[in-house]
Amino acid sequence: MLSLKKYFTEGLIQFTILLSLIGVRVDVDTYLNSQLPPLREIILGQSSAYTQTQFHNLRNTLDGYGIHPKSVDLDYYFTARRLLNQVRALDRFQVPTTEVSAWLVHRDPDGSVSGTQPSAGIALENSGGLQDGTGPDGAVRESGAEQGFGEELEDLGAVAAPVNGDLTKEDIDLIDILWRQDIDLGAGREIFDYSHRQKESEVDKELSDGRERGDGWRSAGGQVTNRNLLVDGETGESFPAQVPGVEDQTALSLEECLRLLEATFPFGENSEFPAADVSTLSEAVPSESRPAGIQSSLLSPLLPETESPFDLEQQWQDLMSIMEMQAMEVNNTTAETLYNGTSGDLLTSNYNLAPNTPINQNVSLHQASLGSCSQDFSLFSSEIESPSMGGSSALLQLAPDNSTGLNTTFSSTNFSGIFFPPQLNSTVNETAGPELPDPLGGLLDEAMLDEISLMDLAIEEGFNPVQASQLEEEFDSDSGLSLDSGHSPASLSSSEASSSSSSSSSSSSSSSSSSSSFSEEGAVGYSSDSENVDFEEAEGAVGYQPEYSKFCRMSYQDPSQLHYLPYLEHVGHNHTYNMAPGTLDPEEPKLPSVGKKSSKEKPSEFLDKQMSRDEHRARAMKIPFTNDKIINLPVEEFNELLSKYQLSEAQLSLIRDIRRRGKNKMAAQNCRKRKLDTILNLERDVEDLQRDKSKLLREKVEFLKSIRQMKQKVQNLYQEVFGRLRDENGQPYSPNQYALQYASDGSVILIPRTLADQQARRQERKQKDRRK
């Protein structure tokens, strides 16, 4: 008794209070059912005549109920029982409700339960909501009292000794049997517990008070807790029966709420928020005729059961992570207002809606990013707003975005207006106070909106946001192309974007030509800007002198010079020193236009840039003909050209040097060309040989497969023929002694095995001799 009393006072009460403080529902009677010995043993003491071994009890030990309340086995039992109850409740439709459990420390002696029959009558009179079952219940209790166990049924949850303690063994056994049958039938201890019925009577009393002010919805909600007690014909026990009207009322309420939600927020197919019909919602859920607690109890338990098409939990986690990164501080009065009961009622009365409304649960970042949300998201009418709030906007009214840097995807949408409306950010009181700064206001400035635009472009077009800064820096250049643009996974799209940007910002034709050339060549390791600019500078399209390339000479950047090798467009050779722009002769004549170029003049055009030093010296020596003629003319024509002019020795020496160097460079180019041709031819030959080898290997595999199949067929035929042969006595020949020999003329001969082996060895020797 000492340990049991200590368990009641220290263990169970303290543990239950702690669980109730953190919001966990605790039913002490269910634990008392299985964890403790039956109450008759507590009251009367244990007796070997009627004590049964509870082999289902997890806390049983060899010496009885001797486990200390602080034992570690209790945690395992509590967890196992809780999980088992959850598993058993999977097939039932449960509507979550909010229950407040009050623990009575000091009990009034007048309200205590005694074992007499008048106390049962008091319990029935005080239990509002059980009036319909008073007659049958009273009959059952009277019959139980006549049998001598009515008091046990009424005072099953009490720990006081009964007045009439003269129970016999048969009565106690009958009580035990009936109690176990109640447990098997699903009737818990709360049916006969006076404290439980007292709680229900208090709830019914509150509901009846609200029914006096309410309407049809409120009256229907009050009938949910009414119970009818039916009598089981087999056991004689009374248990609550489900009233058909209650189930119909619950089902109709749920269907009506779902229908209202579907009509108000059709998220299934529409991509934008339509205008909500608030009048329907206000008529279905009147607020003036019922307190705020009843609104939350009717709407809040039913609305979470509807499945939203969006992952609301993930969206809210993303939003909270953004808030934590920006280190925002929201006023404590806002949190107190949202989570305090009194201020929550004020908020509910102001907006005619429960705090956890479907609007707050169905707002997602995806829907917030739509373009026309601000026009269609009129979820609340003017009558919902409180007059005390002044000129503030509705609960979820979207404000137009004041930023101009956002693209069309995020236009006319204010995220802060969606998730943190002004009504929630301000302190909720009867006077209109100043609004708090928007928690997400710092996130949607000009710089962040530009970054969002770039991120949207990166998602849709494969644009690399890292190149944005490079493009901005290179808008003033002649081409607008970055040197490392080929490293992007979407180099083609980035080049197109840069070409369009540069061509729109530049007035010269060099940007368009370089961009088109870059788009045709693809992702390369160098920029061909200087080459194309030099072409058009010679044509007169650009009025400034371009710089030379710092990476490779221009004469080796033209793909037309190596048209036979497609991938050598990106390979450049640098065999000479770079020349500064100032070393060029300012009086150099302009080359003819692109349309008048011939195939013979193209090589000389590139060689002029390579031989700028020789050109300079030739102009200084006043040589009457160009370097193109000096290098490209045949020997006879070259000699005739020299004979036409009277040239000095210095001029002749310079002409010969120019011709020799030009011929050497052309020969070197031809040599490199021949080497590359040879390498390419060898590579092609190797590839052809590899293809032939693979083809021969496949044919060999096919031949081996055919030979294997033929051998298998010959072996099967050999066995079939050998099996049909018979000797003089009609007996088959033994395959160990005889074998079939194939003659050259196609006949088959039966010979002994030894002779066949000798012939086979001879054949092998002949084959070896032939190989040698």
Curated annotation (Swiss-Prot):
Entry coiled-coil feature ranges: none
Annotated region (Leucine-zipper), positions in chain: 682-696
Pfam families documented for this protein: bZIP_Maf (PF03131)
Glycosylation sites per record: N332, N340, N362, N402, N407, N414, N425, N429, N574
UniProt GO BP: cholesterol metabolic process; regulation of transcription by RNA polymerase II
Gene Ontology terms, MF aspect: DNA-binding transcription factor activity, RNA polymerase II-specific; lipid binding; RNA polymerase II cis-regulatory region sequence-specific DNA binding
Domain bZIP: from-to ranges: 654-717
Assigned GO CC terms: endoplasmic reticulum membrane; nucleus
Motif (Nuclear localization signal): 761-768
Keywords annotated in UniProt: Activator, Cholesterol metabolism, DNA-binding, Endoplasmic reticulum, Glycoprotein, Lipid metabolism, Lipid-binding, Membrane, Nucleus, Repressor, Signal-anchor, Steroid metabolism, Sterol metabolism, Transcription, Transcription regulation, Transmembrane, Transmembrane helix
Region annotation (Disordered) ranges: 198-223, 472-531, 581-613
Membrane-spanning segments: 7-24
Nucleotide-binding found in the keyword field: no
Region described as Basic motif: spans on this chain: 656-675
UniProt note: domains: The cholesterol recognition/amino acid consensus (CRAC) region directly binds cholesterol, as well as campesterol and 27-hydroxycholesterol. Has much lower affinity for epicholesterol.
Protein family: Belongs to the bZIP family. CNC subfamily.
Name the UniProt record assigns to this protein: Endoplasmic reticulum membrane sensor NFE2L1
Organism per entry: Gallus gallus (Chicken)
Name of the gene this protein is made from: NFE2L1
